[in-house]
Amino acid sequence: MSWTTIESDAGVFTDLIENLGVKDVEVDELYSLDVDSLRQFPDIYGIIFLFKWNSKVDKPDGTMDYDSMDNIFFAKQVINNACATQALLSVLLNHSDEIDLGTTLSEFKDFSKTLPPELKGEALGNSEHIRCCHNSFARSDPFISEEVRAATDEDEVYHFIAYTNINNVFYELDGLQAAPINHGSCTKEEFAEKAVSVIQARIANYDPAEIRFNLMVICKDKKASLLTREDLTDEEKAASIAVEDEKRLRWKRENQLRRHNFVGLFVELSKLLVKDRIDKNTWNSTLETAKAKYASQKRP
């Protein structure tokens, strides 16, 4: 079974890592690439960067750090469409001293730690549980094609990479590169400034009209962080937690809609619209009839 494309969305990525067993970590959108915006997040573990891949532009700015591969998790991307989950794991598995990875990822890290990057990538691709969690967030598509073809210059290919701080070094972890890319020394306190500088330099290589970038922060769960904050009153904590709870409910609903295939409903509704030439007064009854007919045809 192949890996499917999943949407670059904070709710998708947060549910994905929770389904893999990770505790008290969330992924959130970064709407502005500046130091103040980054510092609003509690305990940042890394940043996921999505961009339109271009072989002419995407050349490493830092230094290939081959010596680091014995001490950090770095996997080559050998499986199509796995780069989203691979970017997430590139951050999570390199912060296992700070993050509760859960059984699945802890066992995967232990199993793969002595493997070279190519075999780490193969091990990830062959992990049925990780692949199933990843694929569970694919949009429902009734017209699935098993055809596999190489991308052409006309195709728009998007790619995920990770930025993270490991042992006071700022790394770029890209499964399409030969090794981790070292961007120089960086303490935890310097992470925001370093991240802004490195990512802005990369974006500057693109055409000024190119705006198809997406940034997400992997950080400590905001609700868990709020519960331990002593600078907030109980009322302030309750209000902030309510906002986080509402956000999670919205994410859950959106993920449910992503998984659902509405084609059958639309087909049945279209049939009735054409057949009956309904007017506004019969819309609701026609809609309910279409729903019922669609439901009766669904497989158990």
Curated annotation (Swiss-Prot):
SUPFAM superfamilies named among the record's database cross-references: Cysteine proteinases
Highest taxon of source: Eukaryota
Enzyme Commission number, as recorded: 3.4.19.12
Domain UCH catalytic: 2-220
Coiled coil: none
Site feature Important for enzyme activity, where: 174
Listed GO CC annotations: cytoplasm; nuclear periphery; nucleus; proteasome complex
Subcellular location as annotated: Nucleus
Catalytic site: 83, 159
Domain ULD span(s) in chain numbering: 261-290
Cited CDD domains: Peptidase_C12_UCH37_BAP1 (cd09617)
ATP-binding listed as a keyword: no
Record-annotated site: Transition state stabilizer: 77
Function: Ubiquitin-protein hydrolase is involved both in the processing of ubiquitin precursors and of ubiquitinated proteins. This enzyme is a thiol protease that recognizes and hydrolyzes a peptide bond at the C-terminal glycine of ubiquitin.
Family to which this protein belongs: Belongs to the peptidase C12 family.
Protein name per the record: Ubiquitin carboxyl-terminal hydrolase 2
